[in-house]
Amino acid sequence: MPAMLTDVFRGHPIHLPHSHIPDFTSLRELPDSYKWTPKDDLLFSAAPSPPATGENIPLIDLDHPDATNQIGHACRTWGAFQISNHGVPLGLLQDIEFLTGSLFGLPVQRKLKSARSETGVSGYGVARIASFFNKQMWSEGFTITGSPLNDFRKLWPQHHLNYCDIVEEYEEHMKKLASKLMWLALNSLGVSEEDIEWASLSSDLNWAQAALQLNHYPVCPEPDRAMGLAAHTDSTLLTILYQNNTAGLQVFRDDLGWVTVPPFPGSLVVNVGDLFHILSNGLFKSVLHRARVNQTRARLSVAFLWGPQSDIKISPVPKLVSPVESPLYQSVTWKEYLRTKATHFNKALSMIRNHREE
């Protein structure tokens, strides 16, 4: 990430106990600090969608002739979808999964050599959203912004260059895919490149930036009382998630409650982020999601968090705003929005909404 965006985190340091991350494999009982109740998160016990409904986020074949409309419909109704035939080699997905498993399989003290600082973005630690909750989450993460060389050298003195190559190749594929998906979704609304000059599909994508988030949700002795990653929306345009074959990701829909997203081999999950919600004037839904944990199987995921450069103003596309109404949201840069999110968390979107109801 450019320095400007990194400065947001320096200006909002969070005091998270990275050094107190336990050796999850040694815990046979769930510590009280990891036991969640509805008091800790109002949506913790929200009713899950009954399996009989058969409702789930769509799996979209990007080679399907109607993929554009299918993606648009998914963004409007779910705020999330899965994709196949996405062009990312299966071998590369296997490589990034192997890297992620290798990293989190290291001894805790080795991982702490690359711990994220209070004012930093990159490195090992707990989720930044942990500061908004009283209870701890049953997970560990590793954030990559820019080159991971220095951090990886601390973790793997002998093999860090190979792992850096995997990350670089993965990010290159993700950047192209994210831009393609954004434009497929916007095209479904009749939006063209003439309407958003800063995001040309034919450019070298220098208008965008991203972070890579590696996540590990260890086996948990009491999964029904624990939380892997608490409910939140992403501050991105789009997030592209690769998950191994262990279920745990859940998305929330008002009429269904929590819906578990089943892993399909080789597929990727795409989440609409807050900035895409703003850009679409609220037509595309920024999806509330969380991660639950498992008693018998660990879960790994890799999230590509994608958005614009720090100085690009994001505002509703004029074509999507009624001539007799004002845009639903104020114009905001990613840098400005992250500041708002750092203070107001899941209420951040409502804070920049025009004509807020008091």
Swiss-Prot record:
Phenotype on disruption: Semi-dwarf. Ga3ox1 and ga3ox2 double mutant has a severe defect in seed germination and root growth, and a dwarf phenotype.
**A GO cellular component entry from the record:** cytoplasm
Q: Tissue range of expression?
A: Expressed in stems, roots, leaves, flowers, and siliques. Highly expressed near the nodes in stems and in the stamen filaments of flowers. Detected in developing cotyledons, vegetative shoot apical meristem and non-meristematic, non-elongation regions of the roots. Found in the cortex and the endodermis of the embryo axis in germinating seeds and in the placenta in developing siliques.
- InterPro entries recorded: DIOX_N (IPR026992), IPNS-like_FE2OG_OXY (IPR044861), IPNS-like_sf (IPR027443), Iron_ascorbate_oxido_reductase (IPR050231), Oxoglu/Fe-dep_dioxygenase_dom (IPR005123)
Which GO MF term does the entry hold, naming one? gibberellin 3-beta-dioxygenase activity
* Catalytic activity from the UniProt record: gibberellin A9 + 2-oxoglutarate + O2 = gibberellin A4 + succinate + CO2; gibberellin A20 + 2-oxoglutarate + O2 = gibberellin A1 + succinate + CO2
**Keyword line:** Dioxygenase, Iron, Metal-binding, Oxidoreductase
Q: Give a single Pfam family match.
A: 2OG-FeII_Oxy
Q: Which residues cross the membrane?
A: none
Domain Fe2OG dioxygenase, first and last residues per copy: 204-308
Enzyme class, UniProt record, top EC level:
oxidoreductase
Q: Which Gene3D superfamilies match?
A: B-lactam Antibiotic, Isopenicillin N Synthase, Chain (2.60.120.330)
What the record says about the induction of its expression is: Inhibited by GA3, indicating the existence of a probable feedback loop. Inhibited by dihydro gibberellins. Regulated by phytochrome. Induced sharply after red light pulse with a peak at 4 hours, and then decreases rapidly as germination occurs. Increases again when etiolated seedling growth begins. Not regulated by long day exposure or auxin. Up-regulated by cold treatment, paclobutrazol and uniconazole P.
Pathway as given in its UniProt record:
Plant hormone biosynthesis; gibberellin biosynthesis
The parts of the chain that form a coiled coil are none
Q: PANTHER family this protein is in?
A: 2-OXOGLUTARATE (2OG) AND FE(II)-DEPENDENT OXYGENASE SUPERFAMILY PROTEIN-RELATED
Output this protein's name. Answer: Gibberellin 3-beta-dioxygenase 1
Organism this protein belongs to: Arabidopsis thaliana (Mouse-ear cress)
Taxonomic classification, please? Eukaryota, Viridiplantae, Streptophyta, Embryophyta, Tracheophyta
Gene responsible for this protein: GA3OX1
